Amino acid sequence: GGVRNIRDGLAPAFESRPSLVQPVQCEQINGQPNMYLIPGHIGLAEYEVTLGIAQELSGSLVTLQNLPGSIRYLLDQTANSLDIDYVLVDMSPSLGAINQNLLMTSDYFLVPMAPDYFSVMATDSLANVLPKWRNWANSAQSMQVLKSATYPFPEVKTKFLGTVIQKYRLREGNSASSAFQTWIEEIKQGVRKRLIPALKDANMLLPESIYKEFDVDDGKPILQMSEFNGLI
């Protein structure tokens, strides 16, 4: 019994059931006693359209007021049930309503990159989209209808931690091969010249002194790792 995956956990909110959202029964990771996994579910995508409508119209449709705050509520309830300190969400590479909600109700976010054309383009896309998401979230958190919901929309405080560059070939000396290094430099430039200024204007950056303290200012990634499987 009990809730076994993220979709079933959200069902009371999205299917208007007369019951509250309950914590998910997480799977424990072998050899990692302090790590738990919330099982996903392909059916979560079925809620994408409904959530998108709710996030656009929740100010005028009371019947949808419980949806925008329900995902963060579920994660908080699940974390509290296991005395969890940190919740990490691995998001799909899309700009849909679920990702909009997940990112804007999180405390911090990292942007994973691969040294290729698509990540360069994605940097520009994020610079355009994330400020719009922030504007939506600012509006959502000020709506009385969402504040008074069963699952209130949380205070928005999302901040950018940095980028992680991965999936590239190494040459001798453990540095990226020249072809990959070209893309890496282009990504860094895009982050420095386009993404960071856009996030700064949207109040989505930490104080600059923090980035400098950890040597990740000026578009530098938090981590470069050719292949994460090599850490196992």
Predicted feature residues:
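Cytosolic-facing regulatory segments adjacent to core modules
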Residues: F14-G31, Y36-V89, L95
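A mobile, often basic/glycine-rich helix-loop segment
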Residues: G59-Q65, Y108-D124
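Inter-motif core of Ras-like GTPase G domains
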Residues: S70, I98-D116
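C-terminal lobe/tail of nucleotide-utilizing enzymes
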Residues: Q144-I232
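Helical "lid/switch" subdomain of P-loop NTPase nucleotide-binding domains
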Residues: M91, L95-I98, L102, A122
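Conserved nucleotide-binding/hydrolysis micro-motifs of P-loop NTPases
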Residues: I42-L44, D116-F118, Y168-R171
